[in-house]
Amino acid sequence: MNPVASTSALNLARSLYEAGIRNEAVLRAVANTPREQFLEPALGHKAYENTALPIGQGQTISQPYIVARMTEIILQNKPSKVLEIGTGSGYQAAVLAQLVPQLCTVERIKSLQIQARQRLKKLDLHNVAFKYGDGWQGWPSKGPYDAIMVTAAASSVPEALVAQLADGGVLVIPVGELSQQLLKLTRVGNQFTSEVIENVRFVPLVSGELA
């Protein structure tokens, strides 16, 4: 990163600490990730604001706080293999890839998937497998997963994703339509516990693929 972006990213990480993010590894990953590279140049001046921003195709790059919060939750069970549903700009994947050994990410919009792949390659993040496909279906052939993160709101918890969780695995997902809650589901054998983390607002998780 250039010095200005580096300072801005560090300031963003500090603001996330003040907002309640306590995992130092997550804060370092945010500070090391050039968020402006995941946006159109016209929005670059807003890159280090703690806000969601449009990335085209009706999608957004998530608010840095929620990126950090969901990552913090995922890391609680020290996952080796993580599935991300909704690659989007690739920013969340870039943060995760610095913190977990293996990341698999699925995106239904082809143009976004191509851009995200290029961005992560440019950042020399090579522990990420990309799939163009329907996020509702996950990526069964790569599973099971220690953790699954969904970056769009589902009307209900997709059964296909639950089935791809390893024993002890965690699914973090926003659920709801107009009003959404961030849920943490933990698998213990064939049983699941559910915990409400906080109220959130995400774009909807849409089924199918879009070229």
Swiss-Prot record:
GO terms for cellular component: cytoplasm. Its main location: cytoplasm. It comes from the Bacteria. The active site is at S62. It is found in: Cytoplasm. It catalyses: [protein]-L-isoaspartate + S-adenosyl-L-methionine = [protein]-L-isoaspartate alpha-methyl ester + S-adenosyl-L-homocysteine. PROSITE patterns: PCMT. One of its GO terms (biological process) is protein modification process. InterPro entries: PCMT, SAM-dependent_MTases_sf. Keywords: Cytoplasm, Methyltransferase, S-adenosyl-L-methionine, Transferase. The keyword Oxidoreductase does not apply. Its EC number is 2.1.1.77. It is an enzyme of class 2 (transferase). The keyword Methyltransferase applies. Pfam families: PCMT. One of its GO terms (molecular function) is protein-L-isoaspartate (D-aspartate) O-methyltransferase activity. Belongs to the methyltransferase superfamily. L-isoaspartyl/D-aspartyl protein methyltransferase family. Catalyzes the methyl esterification of L-isoaspartyl residues in peptides and proteins that result from spontaneous decomposition of normal L-aspartyl and L-asparaginyl residues. It plays a role in the repair and/or degradation of damaged proteins. This is Protein-L-isoaspartate O-methyltransferase. It comes from Shewanella pealeana (strain ATCC 700345 / ANG-SQ1). The lineage of its organism: Bacteria, Pseudomonadati, Pseudomonadota, Gammaproteobacteria, Alteromonadales.
